[in-house]
Amino acid sequence: MVDQEKETTHFGFRTVAKEQKEGMVAEVFHSVAAKYDLMNDLMSFGVHRIWKRFTVDCSGVRRGQRVLDLAGGTGDLTAKFSRLVGEQGEVILADINESMLRMGREKLRDKGIVGNVSYVQANAEALPFPDNFFDCITISFGLRNVTEKEKALRSMFRVLKPGGRLLVLEFSKPLLEPLSKAYDAYSFHILPKIGELVAQDAESYRYLAESIRMHPDQETLKGMMADAGFENVTYSNLTGGIVALHRGFKF
């Protein structure tokens, strides 16, 4: 029984073999990549931009530093970090999904953001970078899709420089019960309909809603980061806890 538990994980509310989840998540993001930015604006009423700006403001990133935007998708954070680090710095936009990475590359190049940005297709559980390599790592709305989150957090810790910080921006648990009920109703009934109307894909957005519910809550994720080696781990609840920004340091 223990062995069986080790070999399975969740895909939304479903239990699947661990080796299957990566491919299933990949199909979701291949499907939604083309409409990803539009759907983000519609789903969050544009508030995701405020959450991301807060993340950048908390990053402490300075000119000349090296930043990893993990699960960076279409590059919203990468664009902001590119301006902060300047010509002497570097931002690596990494994503496991080829379609999302391609959309990010095309979007940033169309905006003229070139020169200090690199693109790497990478699995968060086994990052292909040297030890002590980055001044800052961010993962925005990506950790909940990772099969082995603890392994990914340890991998991030390894490639972070001493003195560096990790920022995890992710959906979390609303603080108030009325807000939680309203958010559930929106996520499970309205969100898939928006996905069907705009992206012709209700099923992928149903998975995204389920993946949010299965993601660890604020205190659990804080403990997971500490277990991975991060120190001074704190979090800020945003929009009533619908989203939380966790911060941890490597000393």
Swiss-Prot record:
Top-level EC class as recorded in UniProt: transferase
One of the record's GO molecular function terms: demethylmenaquinone methyltransferase activity
Keyword Methyltransferase applies: yes
EC nos: 2.1.1.163, 2.1.1.201
Reactions that this protein is recorded to catalyse: a 2-demethylmenaquinol + S-adenosyl-L-methionine = a menaquinol + S-adenosyl-L-homocysteine + H(+); a 2-methoxy-6-(all-trans-polyprenyl)benzene-1,4-diol + S-adenosyl-L-methionine = a 5-methoxy-2-methyl-3-(all-trans-polyprenyl)benzene-1,4-diol + S-adenosyl-L-homocysteine + H(+)
Pfam families documented for this protein: Ubie_methyltran
Pathway: Quinol/quinone metabolism; menaquinone biosynthesis; menaquinol from 1,4-dihydroxy-2-naphthoate: step 2/2; Cofactor biosynthesis; ubiquinone biosynthesis
Family as reported in the entry's similarity comment: Belongs to the class I-like SAM-binding methyltransferase superfamily. MenG/UbiE family.
HAMAP family the record matches: MenG_UbiE_methyltr
Entry function: Methyltransferase required for the conversion of demethylmenaquinol (DMKH2) to menaquinol (MKH2) and the conversion of 2-polyprenyl-6-methoxy-1,4-benzoquinol (DDMQH2) to 2-polyprenyl-3-methyl-6-methoxy-1,4-benzoquinol (DMQH2).
Name the UniProt record assigns to this protein: Ubiquinone/menaquinone biosynthesis C-methyltransferase UbiE
Species of the source: Yersinia pestis bv. Antiqua (strain Antiqua)
